[in-house]
């Protein structure tokens, strides 16, 4: 393999942190340095670091031992450079930030910018590409909702954590004859609730893609009771919607929520179940625990695979792409195809039928 | 060893479930059956089962494979037979329940009742003993707040779970430069927060026994920032009190809390920190996750030890006692010494100085 | 959905146990009973139970709580009914056993036999099908070497366990500046070594499919040393072969092994490395630890999916098939296509290039 | 608190690595630096680093994030400076090394040397103290065999790992109706086998302190079989001895072992059981897995406690001591009391009776 004239790339992580970021960083940088002889510029705290010029030359030894570590050694932020800051009238600040990014990109003599992030990150990546920069994206998120890839790294680690939590609640539910409601992440996509719900043996799974009726939930719990199962586990995605809510506009939903006192969806579901059935019901919100800790072996493998594939794209100068997994193969898809889309659970996804077959209820009366 | 005329004992688990209950049940029953030839009556769902006569003869094979399981195969409840039900004017119901217990105790031909539980359970046990029953208690609780024993089973499993949660939050805190507040159980005793806080490397630990001032917390966070530590972990016992609150009556505190909108103490602390420091602050409430799952090896050992010691008390007819660990040895202490007391963290406990020595702040300005 | 005239199926687990067997049993039986109204006959200890008529009618409640449990509640054995017992001259015993199986199949009024197992199990299943029985297979094995499916359940749990072990060895290797050799399962297929090797950051991975030269291994270790890495992790599949061995006949290899004193391949590799490099080298054989314990969420999902798919095949009367995963979808493939084949790691598998890209050596000088 | 004139201490880790070393290092250094204003010299790879002068000034920030990490950031070695190297006629090399240590101790202007290690380390520490150096010791070892302290850090982490391994073997044992032998560390002391054996529900536990007879083991396994328990778990300390062996001299034992082909004690026990009972028996040697990985919360607490106590000894100039835990309190005991002693399991240790009470056999016919 003939080596190209030495290239330099910047690398940053953006959006919520998730397991596997460091493994992916390691994959990109090890392959890019040792295999292709490139130079690595590490950018701190996502796009914010690129705006502020917070960047430095790195050596593979800076990535020693990070394969197993949670978080991101580069730091991250939720900075969205194309979005005006709250309170600003127009996009002036936005353009100022984008200009700073472009300026720093050139000052740092980057041939390409490698970004690791979720939907927001890739939207920005696409806009930067249109603004003339070379960009390569890697799909990370515990939500698994990035369009174009079968799976994102971080997702399976979160599934592991949520499943372990459900396992723990099982013993408490059983000991006390209780309904235990567990709320997991997923505003618009129910992947995490679906996977962890099946893996944890959840009796009811509520996801944003399948609106639920309380009546069906109640019926399912009572049928279980009649069969001698005095406890139940209910797995709720934070963005789950009742049929009623699903017919409302976003504004109406917001208003309704303000009126109710439930901090989150899990609390609401727990309250309604207890009221309707008289069963003792408790709620657990998993929250930030889903993001942290060492990545699972699956995610280390996937992140390493994505990372080395990104290095190859760098080498080939094949910019403007996001690496993705499709049918077991790593491919590269144009950023333009990814931006502004969301991968939600299709109602006919085979896992939904799998779950129903073992007796799980989605609150929709099927 | 000469075997006594066969004895029969009832066994029940009462109060919140916690890891190690099954291990303790196994310890009592295996030793009582095989070593001492006793008969075992399993009572369902705590004192409620004894009131309702929900009990059956068990064989050691019913306890196969339970050493590692969370929860309790006997089921539990928070039934307090001596307490009138809400709405009842006097203790009529209470006496009715107690009478039912005494009646069933004799109907089942019990020589002794073995109860596994926390403070409430042992208070009831003491009252039953005074009412003429033979009772032996085993101290379980994740709070470690039972007077008379150095440690309860369930505690170290909860410490493990809470510490693992703190470990996970560390990576998120670090990646985002955030203050992560984690609320753990402990209404009146801060053992769990103290142990998990030190084991997890918490920067600030707030426990009921040491009233905190926000000013000291803020100062500590800012000092860390000046030393380049942009993130911090704050471990809060659910019953932590500010100095102000610590001077209030229980009623005043309740009123104050109603006025504020914070669902729990962790939320309040997080809100105040963010407001006072401007640092991005997030809260995680560990909740029921602390109760569930397989007991840690430490708790399996301790529960087995307590269980076999209880069997020996049964054999010797040494009733009216709770088994306990003191300076590494299992001893038996009179129920009367345990009831109505609470073991909280003494302000001069050596672990508090240990924590301070590695830089942990308790919010008290020391 | 119209229910068929009630069907009855037998279910057995055969071959080495692995995580996910119980989850798959639960999937088949729950779906078959509740969705399709079938009757379930549980057969003990694999084909041996069918030979001996060790079987009984089961109810879904017999499968309560088994989703998370390792092992198999049905028990297993390595009985191969078509193979004569050692010492027998011809296949008389074989035919006797097969006749007993056929007889018991009819005595139990089975409409189909569901077998959960690996390559040997499916070979037998195919022969039984040819002998006139209806059979459906589910692919389990930690080796992932069953032809026709992208992945088997049990594999990812074993990857998790092996990776965790490698993580542990890392700290010891680092503290002592040692070469740590870890031997994992895989006689003919190197999937487990490959996956765990990458996920654990192994520096050298030796698998049966890529013959190794000691010289390349030594060179790689010394290069690492020159870069300041004083320790290394070597992941060895138990069936790894040196280039020399790969050119020998099976008999020659056996003879050679007898002459050497190494209990297993890992010991040999460790010895040769220490001798050739002078580096302190230690070996760990993971052994049975790879089979046990609770299945990973991934395997619970996959096993549940395979189980419910098998129930659907039962319902449709679509016999003579093994359920399989291909490109993310569950399909059914004829037993005849599976039997006698083995799925090994193709030398051009993308993960091998991924591993090389992050600096892993396969001992082949590439 | 009045600060002393700034002191400087060197710190090293020696002997086999174990979980909690980094936590203890962090405890000493954080407390010594922030609380007492001392200077820290980190010495690489145990006493070898002190011989070679491999040392450097450290700052608390060098210890950031190490609380949870396995291994030791200082590196370790098994260097015993007072022992002549193999092949040397007299102790010339020994004295040369000791002289180098003394020379470097003064060159580095150390006021004290803090050593973290096991029995060998503390023996050396005592000799160095007698040679005029100030030394403070911290007891680490997974074997828990250091005289003078109730427990060492590293021990409970190893118990956790070994127990988890036993849990895994349980499912395999059960699925196959097998006897599973697991060998854990412990040449002279059986603490680890005893603790993990009870916590894991081992049916037979063999430790060096209680010589075993095969006949009793066989009897116990057969009794279990008669009660319908077709599988058993046998936990063997690597230094377990049969009654016959216990009566031999060390030389005789060595000779006998050479004659037999068993690589380790676990293999021998497994072989003899299978031969004597006809039960299928398998062996697992846990090996280096017991040393690695993140320390358990218990060990992090204990190591932190020992570390900060050592810092206080440094501050008080209270040299020549090892920190220790006695009846829950941290104390300091003279090195001279510790050296040359070994803490083994007393035959009347209460845990042995606990184990017997739940049906565990120690192979001694009690």
From Swiss-Prot, chains A, B, C, D:
Q: Which Pfam families match?
A: PFK
Arranged from A to Z, the UniProt key words for this protein are: ATP-binding, Cytoplasm, Glycolysis, Kinase, Magnesium, Metal-binding, Nucleotide-binding, Transferase
The residues that the entry says bind substrate are 141-143, 178, 185-187, 238, 282, 288-291
Q: Where is the composition biased (Basic and acidic residues)?
A: 77-94
Question: Which GO MF terms are attached to this record?
Answer: 6-phosphofructokinase activity; AMP binding; ATP binding; diphosphate-fructose-6-phosphate 1-phosphotransferase activity; fructose-6-phosphate binding; identical protein binding; metal ion binding; monosaccharide binding
Q: Where in the cell is it found?
A: Cytoplasm
- Point out the annotated site residues (description: Important for substrate specificity): 120
EC id: 2.7.1.11
What name appears for this protein in its UniProt entry?
ATP-dependent 6-phosphofructokinase
Specify the species. Spirochaeta thermophila (strain ATCC 49972 / DSM 6192 / RI 19.B1)
